[in-house]
Amino acid sequence: ELLQGNPTSFSFVKHLMDINLATLSYSTEFENIGRFGAAVKYINYGSFDEADDFGNRTGEFGANEMAFIIGYANNLDENFYYGANAKFIYSGIADRSSTAMAVDLGLHYAIPDKNWNFGFAVLNLGGQLSKYYETSEAEDLPLDVVVGVSKRLENLPLRLSLDFHKLNEDRDDFIERFKAFTVGAEFTLSKVLKLRLGYDNERRSEFKIGSTAGVAGFNAGLGVKVSDYQFDYGYSSLGLVGGLHRIGISTSL
């Protein structure tokens, strides 16, 4: 759905162990210019035991990452939209740090009378500005080419979506190139309540232990609208390893 007003959102993800992720974002529209946005993302990986070459514990160290994002979006006509993000990324591990710059580019085409939406994006175009060690080789950013489509059904309060990720990565054959996909469904149960279900094929493969995957890759969540506020919760299963909890709140200022 297209953004209206001045949307502001905060989200928090409780990952495995002591890993936590928080995101704060805001955007506003300038007449005849376009929509500008800003966001901050922070990941804390918790604390780790530090040891010498003989395995003797000498203390603790932490690891964290931050991303500062500035975005712009506009429309070419009533159906075709484009946007871009510029990101400054900081990563710190113990007393070492690294920085990077990256750009995201995206296109969105909507057919409102048919309830179709199509998207294309190239994520993380860029590279390191500084390295953890001056003598080490520069690390590549996780470049990702994404194609997606969604459809709101006419006779059911249901929106279906399909996204393909990492289309830029080399695979053994043509079919393998499309193995990183996600499927989603959003049921509008009432004006204030939505139910969401999803499946991540790549995540299911990654968290398969032996021949057992459990419910890894399956997601469930709900959205509740109270007055001018939207509250969202989601759970993503990582199979036998555990799961992720996502909490979000958004409004328009």
Where in this protein do the model-derived segments appear?
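Subset of outer-membrane beta-barrel
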Residues: 1-253
